[in-house]
């Protein structure tokens, strides 16, 4: 019996570190190709896939702002970094035979389409991978907020937030041996407990539009496909008030 996908259309939020090379800087092409392979496995199930990628492996706008660069300027620099990452992912995906489009919130027409919601939806319907770059196009907004906004705009079923940890914990598991992992928690509890899943703007947008988020470990091979086919992996964040801790 063929494996069936639980979702029809998903948005995968990748941090820049998912592509990072040595010292968590730059782009490791091996990581890009590994991600592309996992994306293809999910695409082959018939799932429509959108991506948002951060730029922290190249530039972190908040760090530049702390170093004295004007915050808006620093954020624009960070947005340009996301475009570089998007192009790297596009190249890797196309080498796996996937049709891909990069849509940027900042006009850069020689290398990416401008973001147009209807066009993005049409690409997804035609089974193209759509990579959203350039953030929201405005400073002071994170790429997590971009992911929330785009997922709502193009009608995704869920946001899969790919991280280096296997879910959301009651405390930092690297610092607290007693930290336990949530298997499920509500948006409001995430905000109230300051669990740093996403910034409050991103979480509020998801909460208001009933857009569930699953936080999972992207570095464990097979997790992405397992999630999409319905396995209980990571932490589900939704409007459900039911809080579950798995004790891990």
Swiss-Prot record:
Organism in which the protein naturally occurs: Leptospira interrogans serogroup Icterohaemorrhagiae serovar Lai (strain 56601)
> What is the name of the protein in this document?
Uridylate kinase
- EC number of this enzyme: 2.7.4.22
Class of the enzyme per the UniProt entry, highest EC level: transferase
Which amino acid positions bind ATP, per UniProt?
13-16, 56, 60, 163, 169, 172
Subcellular location field: Cytoplasm
Alphabetical keyword list: ATP-binding, Cytoplasm, Kinase, Nucleotide-binding, Pyrimidine biosynthesis, Transferase
Activity regulation details: Inhibited by UTP.
The entry's function note states: Catalyzes the reversible phosphorylation of UMP to UDP.
Highest taxon in the source lineage = Bacteria
Read off the InterPro entries from this record. Answer: AceGlu_kinase-like_sf, Asp/Glu/Uridylate_kinase, Uridylate_kinase, Uridylate_kinase_bac
Give one GO term, molecular function aspect.
ATP binding
Q: Which reaction does it catalyse?
A: UMP + ATP = UDP + ADP
Q: Where does UMP bind?
A: 55, 75, 136-143
GO annotations under biological process?
A: 'de novo' CTP biosynthetic process; UDP biosynthetic process
Keyword Kinase in the entry? The reply is: yes
Mind telling me which GO cellular component terms the entry cites?
Answer: cytoplasm
The pathway entry for this protein reads as: Pyrimidine metabolism; CTP biosynthesis via de novo pathway; UDP from UMP (UMPK route): step 1/1
Q: Which SUPFAM superfamilies match?
A: Carbamate kinase-like
This protein's major location comes to cytoplasm
Give the record's family classification: Belongs to the UMP kinase family.
